[in-house]
């Protein structure tokens, strides 16, 4: 085990605070509508230019071990806030730096760090309650667009795209962000349920122009095993043919004689069918087949439920208004399932989401909810160059997270105003002793900091603006983009409540840990091993011609 360097008390804290300041100073220049850019070096290709706080934070790694510890702790604030709320990373970093800076002064003057932390926690809890009171629900398209625009660094086109996507697929729908092929942003919406499996034979295509098979008002047969024997399918095929409607077969696989017979019937026009493989694998495949069954009002024909293919009737088949099957995707539009059953299934999956431990599982479950509840929208980001594309895509993803947070917990006036209002409301808060009161004071001072930084980045005098905003009421604040004092909500400068709340809580949590640190242990730098000597002498004369 390598030797360690152990540093105590003020020496440890001072070094860690230096690291906090280096990281925070690099991140905070990006805050607000007039925030500056930060250029990040790349090991290959051109540098990346960004105004995204968390991207800057993730790049920073310091040489000094103790400084790096401090920087990594604040980096944790940014990433945690990004994970929970999707935005507010720069605000959280600014708050953490302020709490650490003010707190260190009190610790240096001999106050008890534990009492300071108790005071900080008390003030944060009161401020969070106050933010919830100020918050108002975010329901209209206009409000959603405003939140998206602010989060994407005042880019209204991104806000509009996200609002349009949410309008099309609902608040629960899946919205994904991809690289576009043109200069303009595009929005593709898939209504109904889509899964990534296409037709098993191109002979099923009945729309050669689009290269898809379209089934109008079809039955849907769901089976969890392979189908290779046509005899198993015959009874149900005869019933469907009598009904004079097309059929979609979704099974683990359809092969051999069964597939050949279906293709021949299709070509001759006897029975219009399309066969596709079931989506997913293992347990997820079973669950997705069950989802499709509930959406179409049918049943999965499986041995576990006591159903067999030979005995299947039309009652066990699902139905839909229209189904489109392409080479790689199948889309079921307007399934005949009961709304009550679909809602119950969505509720059940939501419970699984809450219990899920891995991000991958959670993401897949959320996709299933969206497919049942709404639809899928894809925002294709357009840009002139690769560098611009990456930067814009990161902003769109941030904005998307922020709008989801706004729909979830509502919105508050932006531009640092909500924290100023919450600060005014809790100004009379007191602790049980002078040290706790100092902790409360630290938070009250920190809550001004985001507004100060926004104003400073805009090149104005921060103290004057903070005093003017604090003297106002309600949504009255400073719009740094125009340099005017306005009603922030009317001007469209709003933040999701969840983002502001999470930023404050995470900043206080990590800053409190830093203030109560009394020793730091870091690995000592390894001394370079001496270079090996040259080859030993006396190698000549070994009978070789040199």
UniProtKB/Swiss-Prot annotation:
Catalytic EC class: isomerase
UniProt biased composition (Gly residues): 534-546
Cited SUPFAM superfamilies: GroEL apical domain-like (SSF52029), GroEL equatorial domain-like (SSF48592), GroEL-intermediate domain like (SSF54849)
GO cellular component, one term: cytoplasm
Catalytic activity: ATP + H2O + a folded polypeptide = ADP + phosphate + an unfolded polypeptide
Main location: cytoplasm
UniProt entry tagged with the keyword Cell division: no
EC id: 5.6.1.7
Sequence positions that bind ATP: 30-33, 51, 87-91, 415, 479-481, 495
Annotated GO MF terms: ATP binding; ATP-dependent protein folding chaperone; isomerase activity; unfolded protein binding
One GO term of the biological process aspect: protein refolding
Keywords associated with the record: ATP-binding, Chaperone, Cytoplasm, Isomerase, Nucleotide-binding
Keyword Cytoplasm: yes
NCBIfam families reported in the protein's UniProt record: GroEL (TIGR02348), PRK00013.1 (NF000592), PRK12849.1 (NF009487), PRK12850.1 (NF009488), PRK12851.1 (NF009489)
Similarity-based family: Belongs to the chaperonin (HSP60) family.
Protein's job: Together with its co-chaperonin GroES, plays an essential role in assisting protein folding. The GroEL-GroES system forms a nano-cage that allows encapsulation of the non-native substrate proteins and provides a physical environment optimized to promote and accelerate protein folding.
Protein name: Chaperonin GroEL 1
Organism: Burkholderia pseudomallei (strain K96243)
Taxonomic placement: Bacteria, Pseudomonadati, Pseudomonadota, Betaproteobacteria, Burkholderiales
């Amino acid at each position: 085990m390598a030797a360690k360097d152990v540093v105590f008390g003020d020496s440890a804290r001072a070094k860690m605070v230096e690291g906090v300041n280096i990281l925070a100073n690099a991140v905070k220049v990006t805050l607000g509508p007039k925030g500056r850019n930060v250029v990040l070096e790349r090991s290959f290709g051109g540098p990346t230019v960004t105004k995204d706080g968390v991207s800057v934070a993730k790049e920073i790694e310091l040489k000094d071990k103790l400084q790096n510890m401090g920087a990594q702790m604040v980096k944790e604030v940014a990433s945690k806030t990004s994970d929970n709320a999707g935005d507010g990373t720069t605000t959280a970093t600014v708050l953490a730096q302020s709490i650490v800076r003010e707190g260190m002064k009190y610790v240096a003057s001999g106050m008890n760090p534990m009492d300071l932390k108790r005071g900080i926690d008390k003030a944060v809890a009161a401020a969070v309650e106050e933010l919830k009171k100020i918050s108002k629900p975010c329901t209209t398209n206009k409000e959603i667009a405003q939140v998206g625009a602010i989060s994407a660094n005042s880019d209204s086109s991104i806000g509009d795209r996200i609002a349009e996507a949410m309008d099309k697929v609902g608040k629960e729908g899946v919205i994904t962000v991809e690289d576009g092929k043109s200069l303009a942003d595009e929005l593709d919406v898939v209504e109904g349920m889509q899964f990534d499996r296409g037709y098993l034979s191109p002979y099923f295509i009945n729309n050669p122009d689009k290269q898809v098979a379209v089934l109008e008002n079809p039955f849907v047969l769901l089976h969890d095993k392979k189908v290779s024997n046509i005899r198993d399918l015959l009874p149900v095929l005869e019933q469907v043919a009598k009904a004079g409607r097309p059929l979609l077969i979704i099974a683990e696989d359809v092969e051999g004689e069964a597939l050949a017979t279906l293709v021949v019937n299709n070509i001759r026009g006897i029975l219009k069918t399309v066969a596709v493989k079931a989506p997913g694998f293992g347990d997820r495949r079973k669950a997705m087949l069950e989802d499709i069954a509930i959406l179409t009002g049918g049943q999965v024909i499986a041995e576990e439920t006591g159903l067999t293919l030979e005995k299947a009737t039309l009652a066990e088949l699902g139905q839909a208004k229209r189904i489109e099957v392409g080479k790689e995707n199948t889309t079921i539009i307007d399934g005949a399932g009961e709304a009550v059953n679909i809602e119950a299934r969505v509720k059940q999956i939501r419970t699984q989401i809450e219990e899920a431990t891995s991000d991958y599982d959670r993401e897949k479950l959320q996709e299933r909810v969206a497919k049942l509840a709404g639809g899928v929208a894809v925002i294709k980001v357009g840009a002139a160059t690769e560098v611009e594309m990456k930067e814009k895509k990161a902003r769109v993803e941030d904005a998307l997270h922020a709008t989801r947070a706004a729909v979830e917990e509502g919105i508050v006036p932006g531009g640092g105003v909500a924290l100023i209002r919450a600060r005014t409301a809790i100004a009379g808060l007191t602790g049980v002793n002078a040290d706790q009161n100092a902790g409360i004071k630290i938070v009250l001072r920190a809550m001004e900091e985001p507004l100060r930084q926004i104003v400073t980045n805009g090149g104005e005098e921060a103290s004057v603006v903070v005093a003017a905003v604090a003297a106002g009421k309600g949504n009255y604040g400073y719009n740094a983009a125009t340099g005017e004092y306005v009603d922030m909500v009317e001007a469209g400068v709003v933040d999701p409540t969840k983002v502001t709340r999470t930023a404050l809580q995470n900043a206080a949590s990590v800053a409190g840990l830093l203030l109560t640190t009394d020793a730091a242990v870091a690995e000592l730098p390894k001394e370079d091993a001496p270079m090996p000597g040259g080859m030993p002498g006396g190698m000549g004369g070994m009978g070789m011609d040199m």
